[in-house]
Amino acid sequence: MFLLGFDIGSSSVKASLVNAESGKCVASAFYPKSEAPITAVQAGWAEQDPAMWWTNLKLATADVMNASGIKACDVSAIGISYQMHGLVCVDKDHQVLRPSIIWCDSRAVPYGEKAFKEIGEEKCLKHLLNSPGNFTASKLAWVKENEPELFSCIDKIMLPGDYIAMRLTGEVCTTVSGLSEGMFWDFQKNDVADFLLDYYGFDRSVIPAIRPTFSEQGRITAQAATELGLVEGIPVTYRAGDQPNNALSLNVFNPGEIASTAGTSGVVYGVNGVTDYDPLSRVNTFAHVNHTANNPRTGVLLCINGTGILNSWMKRNVAPEGISYAEMNDLAAQAPIGSAGVSIMPFGNGAERMLQNREVGCSIHGVNFNTHGKHHLLRAAQEGIVFSFKYGIEIMQGMGMNISKIHAGNANMFLSPIFRNTLAGVTGATIELYDTDGSVGAAKGAGIGAGIYKDNNEAFATLEKLQIIEPVEADRAAYADAYERWKERI
């Protein structure tokens, strides 16, 4: 018995096969081998052809089935993870009407800002937990105003994962978690946000049928089975956006738990047990994969643009030439906690939402030309990145979240002892590092949705925990002092 998981990203589509009994990934593949193209007709625009996702999914599926050597009839369920916030528009024949306006397209910002002001900030935050912002509903408002003939042909709107599920099953449906990320969900009414639809002039009929995140959401059609080399009738039993799915992949389901990534940009995704919001909209809040009205589980999402990109900049411009990241970490470790007074603000990769969309740039403070060297700068860069995470976590704590544990994949900045020890020391949280990824998580989510696993604890019982980092009490005061000095610069 095997589970097939797809991760539909903007750069590639990854497929993984998981043995349901052992919980182990037996094969993975991705397409394309270089980054998928993103079309930018104008500055700030970003579009992709949904048919490209399907083509890449077919190629990845063929590779993963060939590599595994298993029979197609042994695939028991399929799960989907996908890039969040993208808009896909289809007509009554399920034909795509225009390229998808994807997550990093900013053309809809003015529409969301206007809606936030005219509907009322308090109402939006209380009901949507967010500003309408640059999310899917605002993208659709742009289409309505700028492409009215095309808009009149829209039968249903979908997120990227909904589109892939439609291609697999022929059924058009979505989830509460998906609707919440598009700003289509009213948390007070526990229903579609009619007030936002009315404001933008959308008919409720464009919203697909709603299915539970963990449930049968359709079965593979004969045509899809032929295209993918699978068998007809395999159920699709899970779908979620990439950030809630990353949390699921790390077995983050309960209030106080955090899933984090620290690549070029960073993400802190914390689970809250109440439907609360940040009054300054510095973080976003969506329905987590296990959210229900009676047992709320919301995902509070913080993005930090200046994460690994700062570390790579330091490698190119400050570190000795030819040095590896591991060697750079060793050099940085020669500096003490707090980098002997040097502070770096890692905000050089665009506006930061947690700073209320201010674009403050990267800056270096406290350098003494007589006493500081490369090692102080390299350590201060990593500490500055961690301190930006801490600053965001404080916003979450202000929303009533009690942060106890941080789960992360053993990759990118989490490979650095300085980074992970600083994060544990300044937050007081235990850090657990795992070997997993989004497509494997989607496969295990499918196992939950199909009833193969009774719950998440059974599904992730074999999740490999590679390392546990506990805060060192003796160092916490030094981390706290360095953080407070850093925070004075914001």
Predicted regions and their residues:
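Surface-exposed, flexible loop/turn segments at secondary-structure boundaries
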Residues: G23, K33-A36, G86, Q95, ...
